[in-house]
């Protein structure tokens, strides 16, 4: 697995050269061709594929399949929202994408928590799943079972997924407890490229 701080050069050695960006008139067909190619590559890949990864997963192939599904879903939401269209996600899919965010992305970041660790309980009502995200000064960890939480977020998997990717307002889910923890979340748990 690629370590963010030590293996960046090694990671980019595997990164494919990106094609030239298409003209606006060709963008939709370019995207469809790229999507078709991605699906074919993932379907044709052997189950024991060895390649660079950056998230914990059962296998490199499962990591990249899951990552690309989530990446496409969240940016589909962004594109549709720019046109005033509300995206819908099937509960099981949204639950899996939420699980990727909370168990793979969030724990790999730098410690951001307060001096006294705080726990956010994320409860997906439609999939009956629970995640307990504890933020502290030394690490952030996610467990599937827990006890007392400082803040509980309750909603559908899709609404939680969008909230925790910082796409929708806090009012989109039910919150019980220390809602100031959402300021910590919004300020620290997001993808940054610099």
Language-model region placement:
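Short, contiguous alpha-helical
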Residues: 1-9, 55-111, 160
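Short, helix-capping/interhelical loops that line the mouth of catalytic, cofactor-
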Residues: 1-50, 85-97, 109
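A generic "alpha-helical surface" signal
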Residues: 25, 29, 63-66, 151
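Short amphipathic alpha-helical/adjacent loop interface patches that line ligand
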Residues: 35, 72, 157
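Conserved catalytic-core motifs characterized by acidic clusters
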Residues: 49-55, 141
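A glycine-rich beta-turn/hairpin centered on an aromatic-Pro dipeptide
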Residues: 98-133
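Acidic/His-leaning functional-site neighborhoods
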Residues: 123-152, 156
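C-terminal interaction segments
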Residues: 146-194
């Amino acid at each position: 697995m690629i370590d963010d701080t030590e293996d960046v050069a090694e990671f980019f050695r595997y990164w494919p050269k990106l094609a030239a960006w298409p003209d606006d008139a060709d963008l939709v067909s370019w995207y469809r061709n790229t999507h078709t190619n991605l699906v074919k590559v993932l379907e044709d890949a052997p189950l024991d594929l060895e390649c660079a990864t950056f998230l914990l997963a059962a296998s490199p192939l499962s990591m990249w399949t899951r990552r690309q599904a989530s990446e496409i879903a969240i940016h589909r939401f962004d594109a549709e929202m720019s046109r005033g269209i509300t995206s819908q996600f099937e509960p099981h899919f949204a639950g899996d994408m939420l699980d990727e965010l909370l168990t793979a992305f969030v724990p790999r970041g730098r410690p951001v928590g307060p001096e006294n660790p705080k726990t956010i309980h994320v409860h997906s009502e439609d999939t009956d799943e629970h995640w307990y995200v504890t933020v502290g000064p030394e690490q952030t960890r996610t467990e599937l079972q827990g006890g007392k939480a400082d803040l509980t977020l309750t909603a559908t998997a899709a609404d939680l997924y969008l909230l925790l990717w910082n796409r929708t307002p806090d009012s989109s889910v039910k919150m019980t407890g220390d809602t100031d923890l959402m300021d910590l979340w919004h300020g620290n748990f997001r993808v940054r490229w610099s």
